[in-house]
Amino acid sequence: MHIKVVHKSVKIKFSKMHGLGNDFIIINAMMQKTFPVTSNIIQNLSNRYTGIGFDQLLLVENSKNVNIDFHYRIFNANGTEVSQCGNGARCFALFVLLKKLTKKRTLYVSTNTTTLILNVLNNGNVCVDMGVPCFKLKNIFGENIIENSLHSIKFVNKIINYDLVSIGNPHCIIYVNNLKKYPVKKIGFYLSTHKIFPEGINVNFVEVLSKNEIALRVYERGVGETLACGSGACASVALGIQQGLLFNEVQVNLLNGILKINWKGGSEKLYMTGPAVHVYDGYFYL
């Protein structure tokens, strides 16, 4: 019996990393310009049974701006490109240091919609300047959204009230009384894929524990529920501060750990601090 061995021509190196269980593969696209970014390839790689398995794929690219250190691209597990990922930003910062792409511990990184400032702290945590939260809904969702209205939607026999915020990507935020018993996956999927959000939306379920602490679960568009969502933590805290429910410094309890969010409100920038972990390096063939 003869077995035909198929040799695939493109070898791609990657690092597996995670921020509180929100996991990624990161690829240095500055050195590996042949990596083809297609939805089909990303979906195959993200499969946790037949591929590597991850929530998002992150690319490190050269910046076209001399004042920016790197360009940061983010692809969800379903292959769609998005503009923000807070946990990914922390892993991005650790990656470029570990791979000696820079010696800087303060990095200026562009995305498709904004510029992030990433600070790698001496204790190994990363503090991310996430910019200014946006509550101007027409800037986020277009002219069909009514500003300052009570947003609600019917799900089975109940009415769900929600708020909308952007922190570089869109978030729908729902306050709940008992996060452990709430049907996060069912309602998360329903809202995330609803026709009122043609590009999808991240759905955040928030239980306010005190003025300086919340519990949070997030159903991410194009991924599903994740163990943590950095931008979701930022958006949820920003809304709580704006509504007077929270103080300016808040601990966010996610399924797999804790993030610290600091925002003084108004036009001030919001800061997120948390860990980033390198798991292993590997390669795959295409």
Curated annotation (Swiss-Prot):
<feature type="site" description="Could be important to modulate the pK values of the two catalytic cysteine residues">
    <location>
        <position position="220"/>
    </location>
</feature>
<feature type="binding site">
    <location>
        <position position="22"/>
    </location>
    <ligand>
        <name>substrate</name>
    </ligand>
</feature>
<keyword id="KW-0457">Lysine biosynthesis</keyword>
<keyword id="KW-0963">Cytoplasm</keyword>
<dbReference type="GO" id="GO:0005829">
    <property type="term" value="C:cytosol"/>
</dbReference>
<feature type="binding site">
    <location>
        <position position="169"/>
    </location>
    <ligand>
        <name>substrate</name>
    </ligand>
</feature>
<keyword id="KW-0028">Amino-acid biosynthesis</keyword>
<keyword id="KW-0413">Isomerase</keyword>
<feature type="site" description="Important for dimerization">
    <location>
        <position position="280"/>
    </location>
</feature>
<dbReference type="GO" id="GO:0008837">
    <property type="term" value="F:diaminopimelate epimerase activity"/>
</dbReference>
<feature type="binding site">
    <location>
        <begin position="220"/>
        <end position="221"/>
    </location>
    <ligand>
        <name>substrate</name>
    </ligand>
</feature>
<feature type="binding site">
    <location>
        <position position="76"/>
    </location>
    <ligand>
        <name>substrate</name>
    </ligand>
</feature>
<dbReference type="GO" id="GO:0009089">
    <property type="term" value="P:lysine biosynthetic process via diaminopimelate"/>
</dbReference>
<comment type="similarity">
    <text>Belongs to the diaminopimelate epimerase family.</text>
</comment>
<feature type="binding site">
    <location>
        <position position="56"/>
    </location>
    <ligand>
        <name>substrate</name>
    </ligand>
</feature>
<feature type="active site" description="Proton acceptor">
    <location>
        <position position="229"/>
    </location>
</feature>
<dbReference type="InterPro" id="IPR001653">
    <property type="entry name" value="DAP_epimerase_DapF"/>
</dbReference>
<feature type="binding site">
    <location>
        <begin position="230"/>
        <end position="231"/>
    </location>
    <ligand>
        <name>substrate</name>
    </ligand>
</feature>
<feature type="site" description="Could be important to modulate the pK values of the two catalytic cysteine residues">
    <location>
        <position position="171"/>
    </location>
</feature>
<comment type="function">
    <text>Catalyzes the stereoinversion of LL-2,6-diaminopimelate (L,L-DAP) to meso-diaminopimelate (meso-DAP), a precursor of L-lysine and an essential component of the bacterial peptidoglycan.</text>
</comment>
<comment type="pathway">
    <text>Amino-acid biosynthesis; L-lysine biosynthesis via DAP pathway; DL-2,6-diaminopimelate from LL-2,6-diaminopimelate: step 1/1.</text>
</comment>
<protein>
    <recommendedName>
        <fullName>Diaminopimelate epimerase</fullName>
        <ecNumber>5.1.1.7</ecNumber>
    </recommendedName>
</protein>
<feature type="binding site">
    <location>
        <position position="202"/>
    </location>
    <ligand>
        <name>substrate</name>
    </ligand>
</feature>
<comment type="subunit">
    <text>Homodimer.</text>
</comment>
<dbReference type="InterPro" id="IPR018510">
    <property type="entry name" value="DAP_epimerase_AS"/>
</dbReference>
<dbReference type="Pfam" id="PF01678">
    <property type="entry name" value="DAP_epimerase"/>
</dbReference>
<feature type="active site" description="Proton donor">
    <location>
        <position position="85"/>
    </location>
</feature>
<feature type="binding site">
    <location>
        <begin position="86"/>
        <end position="87"/>
    </location>
    <ligand>
        <name>substrate</name>
    </ligand>
</feature>
